[in-house]
Amino acid sequence: MKKDILERLETEIKACKRYAENSIKKSREGNIGSAINLLDVAGTAKKCADQLHEELWKESQGNLNEEEFELFSESETLDRELKKAYKELNIARQR
């Protein structure tokens, strides 16, 4: 169960980061519609990662090895990725 949660969490983290990065690229290109769509997917991936973050904590009862803790911690930084993408989208909208 724990291994499954870790794999799913890693997938959602990667998806959130990838879609947020691609949203930033589309914003810089002036393709607002695509940037919004990509940012929406990134936000959904973050929500899934948040749920898995909580599941992992409950399943492990706070006993995580170093590798698991790194992944656990990385999921807590996804807000920054989304904020960067939102900022770039707002800049693109003002052009």
Each language-model region and where it sits:
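Long, low-complexity or tandemly repetitive, helically biased scaffold regions used
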Residues: K2-R95
